From Swiss-Prot:
It holds the Pfam family DUF896. Its main location: cytoplasm. The lineage of its organism: Bacteria, Bacillati, Bacillota, Bacilli, Bacillales. This is UPF0291 protein BH2353. The keyword Glycosyltransferase does not apply. Belongs to the UPF0291 family. Keywords: Cytoplasm. It comes from Halalkalibacterium halodurans (strain ATCC BAA-125 / DSM 18197 / FERM 7344 / JCM 9153 / C-125) (Bacillus halodurans).
Amino acid sequence: MLSKQKIERINELAKRAKTTGLTEDELREQKKLREEYIQQFRQSFKNQLHSVTVVDGAGNDVTPDKLKQSKNKYRNDIH
């Protein structure tokens, strides 16, 4: 997860961008922080999806094949 300070900085830069504008350095910093945030968000979301198993009313595993393949690839990549 992104540190609290980085999230606060993202919000500070967004607020300033709407009011007074940002310098070139601040725009680069904002872009870098946003990319880092999105990357961590996506990884967290993937981790959540890899812990999901879909079952029907009868208790049968009906997890989509694409998700099963992604889980297997993820497990093989980390081991």
